[in-house]
Amino acid sequence: MSFVLAIDQGTTSSRAMVFRSDISIAAVAQQEFPQHFPASGWVEHEPEDIWTSTVMTCRDALEKAGLAAKDIAAIGITNQRETTVVWDRATGQAVHRAIVWQDRRTADICAKLKAEGHEPDVSARTGLIIDPYFSGTKVAWILDHVPGARERAERGELLFGTVDCYLLWRLTGGRVHATDATNASRTLLFNIHTGQWDDTLLKLLRVPRSMLPEVKDSSADFGTTTPDLFGGPIKVAGIAGDQQAATIGQACFTPGMMKSTYGTGCFALLNTGATPVKSNNKLLTTIAYQLNGIRTYALEGSIFVAGSAVQWLRDGLGIIKHAAETGPLADKSDSMQSVYLVPAFVGLGAPYWNPRVRGALFGLTRNTGPAELAHATLESVCYQTYDLWAAMRADWPDASAATIVLRVDGGMTASDWTMQRLADLLDAPVDRPMIQETTALGAAYLAGLNAGVYPEPEKFADNWRLEHRFRPAMSAATRQRKLAGWARAVKGVLASDEGE
């Protein structure tokens, strides 16, 4: 058994990939599923859609690879983080749609907690800030708004889990209720210093401990699938949240290594080693991975809108038919125009953390057209990455002693235009790897490590291969002018916040 099956459950689709022992890809399957937007700022998924699409893609990938369950050494799971599911322990029936990480409905709960002065203590325990992004307030909302849910939870009848936990519970036929440290660290309920669920936080958010899963290493024995799913049992041996899995897939095992993933949003992680680094620039302190009971930490910056801004160009404005058209269109833009898009469609993430502001375009003229809008959209992702980059360099103690090279992955990195502009604005090299499926690869590696298919991290890192290095080519004067314009645009958006 030299094959590993990776489940990559994302915000808009579920994917399954079969990896060989040399980390080459044997098969890929993908299935999209709908998102639901019942109110402004609300984003939901049907848990059954998540489950069904996951099982179907796994079966499809196995069929494409010509493999059976007996050929698979282990399954690794990576998932959209923070997305929250609450279900009945006895029936497996979800009591509410999954509340997605992008969802902002708990902004008022968060504002109240902040006003009561809880954020410093919460941040010290979790490494996070109080924000609707994280799972804790989503759980509280479900318990308070679904009739009878709180009473059922207090009687021990309901379970909570992030998507990995929910899938594991279903895959194992309800026998295993567990997660890993990376996903637990995104809930606002987990103490990243003790590695335990925190009773003070549970009391603050009124979440019964009986709802919570067991927390394990990222590479561990998570049980086996029921035989009926794939024609035989397969052990589940690795779990990590999508951004941590990408960090592993990018082989960022050394402190000071940084990766940025461009999907629906953009997420940058900087490995800080065995010591959690407290940010002075509104970054998050999180767990990068946990192996053999040892936690490795990271600084993280989260941008809510990246690839979804390109989807807006396609679906909202209709100026492109396919995402791949965006770069060539942007290349035709008028260089004399300075158009800035601040894509705060669901608020702003790091380092601003304002859930109330909304997006805006600046610098429009009568001559502004589709090319300029495409240019501004792609550039907005680069500017937001610059904000994270600058904050990480300020927070990381060794930044002055070493140049951080950024490793990138995700759908948007296929755009040479965007990656070159990113290198220009960062004034630093940007490395795109040969294997772009780094998130799935990270999940596969964790499972394969436990199953004996893959070697220890240091040796695994030797397999990382560079596809292209983008080097900065923009003049310092142009760079500073463009960054100053971006700063003014963000300031304008933040000034529009009336605190309502």
Swiss-Prot record:
Belongs to the FGGY kinase family. Pathway: Polyol metabolism; glycerol degradation via glycerol kinase pathway; sn-glycerol 3-phosphate from glycerol: step 1/1. Its EC number is 2.7.1.30. It is an enzyme of class 2 (transferase). Keywords: ATP-binding, Glycerol metabolism, Kinase, Nucleotide-binding, Transferase. One of its GO terms (molecular function) is ATP binding. Inhibited by fructose 1,6-bisphosphate (FBP). ATP binds at T11, T12, S13, T264, G307, Q311, G411. Gene3D superfamilies: 3.30.420.40. GO terms for biological process: glycerol catabolic process; glycerol metabolic process; glycerol-3-phosphate metabolic process. Key enzyme in the regulation of glycerol uptake and metabolism. Catalyzes the phosphorylation of glycerol to yield sn-glycerol 3-phosphate. This is Glycerol kinase.
